[in-house]
């Protein structure tokens, strides 16, 4: 991802709302989001492929209440911060814009200018996919359309009594559990989600485990953290494949009567410039804690 977006410190006004303009982030969305009860917020925030006025493209929606200006930069507009300035929706600092011509797989970031003139280049907190590290851009991804085959598992899960049924959980980190020999095409040696699904299911059934607990699935920049430095909570890490391939992993395990638990990290995240820390120039996804010296 290019970190040299074409920008200027001069204030640019967001496009005026045309007569009859209906934001995708509706008044109900605004209310639920403001009440912290929007339990399907991932369906509205982030990048979503859609059609508007007969044009195919994508909606982009982000929360940045402390920003002076927000725009979408990406390979579809030459990473130009002038090209797609976002409109503010409501009073809670949510911004959105529809960009025609955007297709699945395109990389993007949010350009955020703070009131004091700082320019930030942030990955999308609600992205479904990310550029493979060391790249830090988000990627437009379509997550609908996968044909699940785990209906039998879901039906039986409703009858499962954790207090009375046998439970044996195998905790596993995909990137270190099993690797291919080194090759130029796969220097990391990682199994992709599909390969991992088959090898893991065979092992778990052989050993008699009922569930697996997957570590390091949410996107993170540093391999050595084992996934404990999250930058994208909604994006299965691109190290091992695509969101649809991750769905295959879950689906295949379920079809083999193996439950899936995700190990995730809500308590902390890294300070990487593209991540969640000081997202719009101030603490947004974290508390602002002021420490004083004991002396």
Regions found by a protein language model. Give the residues of each.
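The feature marks proteins involved in alpha-glucan
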Residues: 1-55, 59, 89-171, 176-184, ...
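Short proline/glycine-enriched turn/loop motifs at strand-loop junctions of beta-rich domains
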Residues: 63-69
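Short, surface-exposed loop motifs enriched in S/T, G, D/E and P with embedded aromatic residues
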Residues: 81-89
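Conserved small/polar residues in nucleotide/adenosyl-binding loops
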Residues: 291-295
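Hydrophobic faces of well-ordered beta-strands that scaffold small-molecule active sites
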Residues: 170, 212, 260-262
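Aromatic-lined carbohydrate-binding/catalytic grooves of carbohydrate-active enzymes
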Residues: 179-180, 187-191, 203-245, 269, ...
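Conserved, mostly hydrophobic/aromatic
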Residues: 62, 110, 172, 214, ...
